[in-house]
Amino acid sequence: NVVQTPMFLNSRDEFKNYLGKSKKPFMATFYKEVRKKSGILMGADGNPIGGKWSFDEDNRNKLPKDISIPKFPKINETNHTKKLKPVIEKLFKDHPGSTNDFWLATDYNDVVKLLDFFIKEKSNLFGDYEDAVNQKNNILFHSALSPYMNLGLITPEFIIKKILEFHKKHKIRMNSL
C-alpha cells in the first residue's frame, strides 16, 4: 500500500491512469496532461503560456567560454555538520571530494536560501544551458535542489509556487520555466 506524499506532484494512481489510457505513453504527453490538470503555466484560454508545450529545442545552447556562473551562497555550518565532518573524513578518506568545501544545506531555512538564490541568480539562464556541460563546473545554472526534495526538506509544489511568483514580477524566460 503506497501512501500519497507531498514530495510528488502526482500520485501513483494518476500515473497508472495515464498509462492505462495511453496507447503510446511518452513523458511529454504526461507532462502536458499534468499541466492541463494543474493549471501550471496555462493561460485562461486553456493553452500553454508561451504558445507551446515544450521549449526543449531552446535548451541546448553551448556554454560561452566567458560566461559568469554564479557561485552558490555559503551555507552556515551547523553543530551537527561540524560533528559529522571528522567522521566523514575518517570513513571516506579514499573517496573524491573534501569536507572543506561542504555546500549542502542541512535544514529547511538554508534550502529556501538556495532556492531563492537559484530563482534570482540562475533561473533565467537555466533553460539556455540546461544541457550544457563544463569540466570546471558540474552544476552550471541548475538549481541542485533534487537532493533536498529527495530528503523531504522541500516540496516540488513549494518550488513551483516560488518560481511562478518570481516570474510574475520579473519574467523568467519560458525555456527556463
Located regions from the model:
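Catalytic cores of enzymes that engage adenine nucleotides and/or redox cofactors via long glycine-rich
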Residues: N59-L177
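Beta-rich, aromatic/charged-enriched effector core domains that present basic-aromatic interfaces
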Residues: N1-L104
